[in-house]
Swiss-Prot record:
Catalytic activity: 4-imidazolone-5-propanoate + H2O = N-formimidoyl-L-glutamate
Cofactors, names only: Zn(2+); Fe(3+)
The name this protein goes by in its record: Imidazolonepropionase
Family: Belongs to the metallo-dependent hydrolases superfamily. HutI family.
Source species of the chain: Pseudomonas aeruginosa (strain UCBPP-PA14)
Length: 402
């Protein structure tokens, strides 16, 4: 069934560029975009429905390409500790941080995790998100990682959004493997990944490359295991120090390397040559009160696509608005509003391997878009908080209006 969506303007991101169509029209046929362009050039057709968008601005549906939305427990107490001057590393060394969430997640039932994640994700969906990634990594044993990944798959069946599932078993060292990091990495590679991938629960594999997590050599073993299973890889890299994890990710043609505050010029060059997306996470930068900025100019020089994500997690970025991350990326990291919009649409799609069907308004792609009641697209990065009036469309069907 063909629908005509008209009386609107569009920021299409067509062809990987920030492109504007004034007085636009968009035609959908089933769940796909059939035509988009200036309304004056609209070909005649027999449309089953004509929808007046009242001068709204259309953008591709927003994509949150890095979240940890499934977890048990609450770490607001650590927020208070950090305000008193305790560092992230000190909290982790005392048994807090990821370890405390692991305990709570292991104790929670699948139904409890499903219900709590749904509550967290509803604000993101109302914010215009039509696709997102959710990582495991708070289970750190086979049964608990399986539980998390099953919840992620169930969320994908229930939410009006495309959900990608990433296995982050190499997130931290579980207590039962204290002092035996190499043994745990071997367990991930020989047992956990084959089992979880064999059950169809994994779309990609991630790891945390940092002094308080895993070394580049250990991460590489995980990447090799993922490659043998035919799974793409991603990496938390250069958040707190420079271990050149982003260059390692580039060598394995990773979909993305994320955080990147301490990456070097050579790291940026490697990522640009490999086509690995840089995922910027300003929420964690802000909450941890970091001062080392990601090298945005180096990323630009080497043509590295920059995505932006919420990093929704209980410890370092309890962020429930992807649109707020646009403002943070512009204000803290000095991205332009155009770069920020591309970062939560086209480049975010690339960071998840979804760019063939998501991330821009082009013929043949899924009709996932948002109709915003704004005067110009830069307002998406300008307004702080609130729920901008909008209509969220997924697969050519309205899923939210507010």
């Amino acid at each position: 069934m063909k629908r005509l969506w008209q009386h609107c303007h569009a920021a299409t991101l067509k062809g990987g560029k920030y492109s504007i169509v004034e007085d636009a029209a968009l035609v959908t046929d089933g769940p796909l975009i059939h035509w988009i362009g200036p309304r004056a050039e609209l070909p005649p057709d027999d449309y089953a429905e004509r929808i007046d968008l009242d001068g709204a601005w259309l953008t591709p549906g927003l994509i949150d390409c890095h979240t940890h939305a499934v977890f048990g427990g609450n770490r607001s107490g650590e927020f208070e500790q950090r305000l008193e001057g305790v560092s992230y590393a000190e909290i982790a060394a005392a048994g807090g941080g990821i370890a405390s969430t692991v305990r709570a997640t292991r104790e929670a039932s699948e139904e409890e995790l499903l219900a709590s994640a749904r509550k967290r994700l509803d604000p993101l969906l109302r914010d215009g998100v039509t696709a997102l990634e959710i990582k495991s990594g708070y289970g750190l044993d086979l049964a608990s990682e399986r539980k998390m990944l099953r919840v992620i798959r169930r969320l994908g069946e229930r939410l009006p959004a495309t959900v990608r599932s990433t296995c982050l078993a190499a997130h931290a060292l579980p207590p039962e493997y204290a002092g035996r990091a190499d043994d745990y990495i071997e367990h991930i590679c020989s047992t956990m990944l084959p089992a979880l991938a064999g059950e169809g629960l994994v779309d990609a594999v991630d790891a945390f490359c940092e002094h308080l997590a895993f070394s580049p050599a250990q991460v590489e073993r995980v990447f090799i295991a993922a490659r043998e299973l035919g799974l793409p890889v991603k990496l938390h890299a250069e958040q707190l120090s420079s271990l050149h994890g982003s260059s390692l990710a580039a060598r394995y043609r990773a979909l993305s390397a994320d955080h990147l505050e301490y990456m070097t010029e050579d790291d940026a060059r490697s990522m640009g040559e490999a086509g690995t997306v840089a995922v910027l996470l300003p929420g964690a930068f802000y909450l941890l009160r970091e001062t080392q900025l990601p090298p945005i100019d180096a990323l630009r020089r080497h043509g590295v696509a920059m995505a932006i994500a919420s990093d929704l997690n209980p410890g370092t970025s309890p962020a429930l608005s992807l649109r707020l991350m646009l403002n943070m990326a512009c204000t803290l990291f000095r991205l332009t509003p155009e770069e920020a919009l591309a970062g939560v649409t086209l480049h975010a799609a690339r960071a998840l391997g979804l760019e063939a069907r998501h991330g821009s308004l082009e013929v043949g792609k899924l009709a996932d878009f948002v109709a915003w009641d704004i005067e110009r697209p830069a307002e998406l990065a300008y307004w702080l908080g609130g729920d901008l009036p909008k209509r969220v469309i997924r697969h050519a069907e309205e899923v939210y209006r507010g």
